[in-house]
């Protein structure tokens, strides 16, 4: 993605969060000069990969497959004294935008609808050979309540409600078309997005 596209996405996200009275940590708003001024104080932020991550996952279709993420806090796998003992992120989606289908091996996460539109989720089990199971039903938990969905069936999560995603379950989620953008929250185990995302759709 071009730097101009990334900057525009951050600006739009901040405006959307402000509209919903959701404030990010101070470093979310720093200018390049402020990052330079604080460069001796941000080793932990760098190590736990805190901050903005705007990506189209190599799709070239950001408005369809992509997300605007901000890691508020995280720890470091294998280093319990670094950062926080859990992770928290905000994921912001344009209307109709979603993540590519993927699963995790280590991470368990709660995904919460924090504001604006409706979150649309789809689940698929993983076959023993690693491929996606497009046929079997999936049991999932929404705020502790067990639910069952058919493979690939859209599940709609309204504001304030959440879904727990467990390892080895393929999933995708984003903003339901027709309901506007989405602010989603993620609370999870400490994680490393560079090593624990296994995609079932092409990414780069």
Predicted regions and their residues:
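Short beta-strand His + acidic residue motifs that chelate non-heme Fe in jelly-roll/DSBH
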Residues: 100-102, 111, 121-122, 155, ...
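A short catalytic or substrate-binding loop motif that flags glycine-/basic-rich loops and adjacent residues
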Residues: 62-65, 82-84, 93, 104-105, ...
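Short amphipathic
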Residues: 92, 153-156
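Short histidine-centered beta-strand/loop micro-motifs
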Residues: 79-83, 89, 100-105, 110-113, ...
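A short, N-terminal "cap"/entry segment at the start of jelly-roll beta-barrel domains
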Residues: 1-86
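Double-stranded beta-helix
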Residues: 2, 128-150, 172-204
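Glycine- and acidic-residue-biased ligand/ion/polar-headgroup-sensing regions
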Residues: 94-95, 107-109, 113-129, 134, ...
């Amino acid at each position: 993605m071009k730097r101009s596209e990334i900057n525009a996405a951050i600006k739009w996200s901040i405006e959307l969060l402000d509209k919903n009275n959701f404030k990010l940590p101070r470093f979310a708003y720093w200018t390049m000069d402020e990052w330079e001024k604080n460069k001796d104080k941000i080793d932990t932020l760098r190590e736990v990969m805190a901050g903005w991550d705007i990506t189209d996952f190599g799709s070239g279709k950001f408005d369809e497959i992509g997300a605007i993420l901000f890691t508020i806090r995280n720890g470091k796998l294998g280093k319990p004294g670094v950062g926080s003992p859990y992770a928290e992120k905000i994921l912001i989606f344009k209307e109709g935008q979603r993540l590519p289908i993927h699963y995790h091996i280590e991470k368990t996460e709660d995904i919460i609808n924090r504001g604006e539109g409706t979150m649309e989720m789809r689940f698929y089990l993983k076959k023993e050979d690693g491929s996606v199971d497009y046929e079997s039903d999936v049991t999932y938990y929404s705020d502790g309540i067990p639910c069952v969905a058919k493979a690939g069936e859209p599940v709609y999560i309204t504001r304030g409600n959440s879904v727990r995603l467990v390892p080895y379950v393929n999933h995708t989620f984003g903003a339901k078309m027709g309901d506007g953008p989405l602010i989603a929250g993620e609370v999870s185990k400490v994680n490393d997005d560079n090593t624990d995302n296994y995609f079932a759709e092409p990414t780069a």
